[in-house]
Amino acid sequence: MKSKIDYTLYLVTDHQLMSTKTLEEAVEQAIAGGCTLVQLREKTASSRDFYQNAINVKTITDKYNVPLIINDRIDIALAVGADGVHVGQSDLPAAVVRKIIGNDKILGVSAGSVEKAIEAQKIGADYIGVGALFSTSTKTDAKAVSIETLMKIVREVSIPVVGIGGINAENAVQLKNTGIRGIAVVSAIISQKDIKSSAEKLLEIFVNKA
């Protein structure tokens, strides 16, 4: 059920940054470290490679009963039976995506303002990804979003909000009391030598309320 999705530690992949030989290894280690949700994001991969990667990664997420979200590529999400799709403001409109994937799939939408977040909720998004909260090398064109704006978005929408953008073990503590449901992380997990322990550390920092 979509209402029971755990967004706490949301892994976003990037095969160019991973420290392992395969995406499957990276994803499995991240899940072992506590990642609760996985998004396959491969902006430079060919359609064939993306499709194959999605099949391979889904074998891992299915094994551990962790939802798999596909970034942008609705066709691939449907082809492999992924749990949902995440789209940005420059991708296919979220309302159109919802019509294509139906109501049973998870729909995540990126938003950098209160207005965009409210709009995303109205068209049927299940969660909102807000960022970039910190400087990030994985999305150099991302506009910065302040912690203040993040908290305003949390107050204005009733669906889960996930923080994204440059989140790591040093700054994750700043997000603990913002009201967000989870943190989405790329390089601070997938590019680390010990992916499992890196995920465990981030989870401990974010979840620990001390």
UniProtKB/Swiss-Prot annotation:
This is Thiamine-phosphate synthase. Mg(2+) binds at D72, D91. HAMAP family: TMP_synthase. Belongs to the thiamine-phosphate synthase family. SUPFAM superfamilies: Thiamin phosphate synthase. It is an enzyme of class 2 (transferase). InterPro entries: Aldolase_TIM (IPR013785), ThiamineP_synth_sf (IPR036206), ThiamineP_synth_TenI (IPR022998), TMP_synthase (IPR034291). Binds 1 Mg(2+) ion per subunit. It catalyses: 2-[(2R,5Z)-2-carboxy-4-methylthiazol-5(2H)-ylidene]ethyl phosphate + 4-amino-2-methyl-5-(diphosphooxymethyl)pyrimidine + 2 H(+) = thiamine phosphate + CO2 + diphosphate; 2-(2-carboxy-4-methylthiazol-5-yl)ethyl phosphate + 4-amino-2-methyl-5-(diphosphooxymethyl)pyrimidine + 2 H(+) = thiamine phosphate + CO2 + diphosphate; 4-methyl-5-(2-phosphooxyethyl)-thiazole + 4-amino-2-methyl-5-(diphosphooxymethyl)pyrimidine + H(+) = thiamine phosphate + diphosphate. Keywords: Magnesium, Metal-binding, Thiamine biosynthesis, Transferase. One of its GO terms (cellular component) is cytoplasm. Pathway: Cofactor biosynthesis; thiamine diphosphate biosynthesis; thiamine phosphate from 4-amino-2-methyl-5-diphosphomethylpyrimidine and 4-methyl-5-(2-phosphoethyl)-thiazole: step 1/1. Pfam families: TMP-TENI (PF02581). 4-amino-2-methyl-5-(diphosphooxymethyl)pyrimidine binds at Q39, L40, R41, E42, K43, N71, S110, K139. PANTHER family: THIAMINE BIOSYNTHETIC BIFUNCTIONAL ENZYME, THIAMINE-PHOSPHATE PYROPHOSPHORYLASE. 2-[(2R,5Z)-2-carboxy-4-methylthiazol-5(2H)-ylidene]ethyl phosphate binds at T136, S137, T138, G166, V186, S187. GO terms for biological process: thiamine biosynthetic process; thiamine diphosphate biosynthetic process. NCBIfam families: thiE.
